[in-house]
A protein has these predicted regions:
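Mixed-charge, Lys/Arg-rich low-complexity intrinsically disordered regions
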Residues: 1-13, 18-22, 29-32, 103-106
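Intrinsically disordered, low-complexity segments enriched in polar/charged residues with Gly/Pro
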Residues: 1-3, 43-45, 88-89
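Generic alpha-helix detector with strongest preference for long hydrophobic helices that associate
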Residues: 4-6, 38, 73-74
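Intrinsically disordered, low-complexity boundary segments flanking structured domains
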Residues: 12, 41-46
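Short amphipathic alpha-helical leader/targeting segments
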Residues: 25-26, 37
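Surface loops and adjacent helix of pleckstrin homology
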Residues: 26-28, 69
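Short, solvent-exposed secondary-structure boundary/capping segments
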Residues: 32-41
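Intrinsically disordered, low-complexity, charged/polar segments
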Residues: 47-106
Length: 106
């Protein structure tokens, strides 16, 4: 299988194409790396291909914050410039500039 190149980077703020949530990327798997049960739980009309990057997000919607795994095909850049209000942001990232978060080097 060919190595996939990720379209998004750690720290990028993104939004879901089909569902009303957004988040910041904190990790990436370059191909599907979750359970088959999780995969089958995704509605068929938006179920992604497995041969693409999957991003781990600190996510939020109007009601809650949570962590989400989302395929590249279901993500868009979030250009709202609004910060993500997730309680784990400060544990992973040092700050925000424009539409992305960054980590300071150790």
């Amino acid at each position: 299988m060919a190595i996939q190149k990720a379209k998004f980077s750690i720290g990028d703020i993104v939004k879901h194409k089909h569902f009303d949530f957004r988040g910041v990327i904190y990790d990436v798997d370059f191909e599907f790396n979750n359970s088959e049960e999780w995969y089958q739980s995704i509605p068929k009309n938006v179920r992604p291909r497995k041969d693409q990057p999957f991003y781990h997000l600190l996510a939020e919607n109007d009601e809650i914050t949570y962590e989400a795994d989302v395929s590249e095909q279901n993500l868009l850049v979030d250009d709202s410039d609004e910060p993500i209000k997730h309680p784990l942001i400060e544990e992973i990232f040092s700050g925000k500039k424009g539409s992305s978060y960054f980590k300071l080097s150790n």
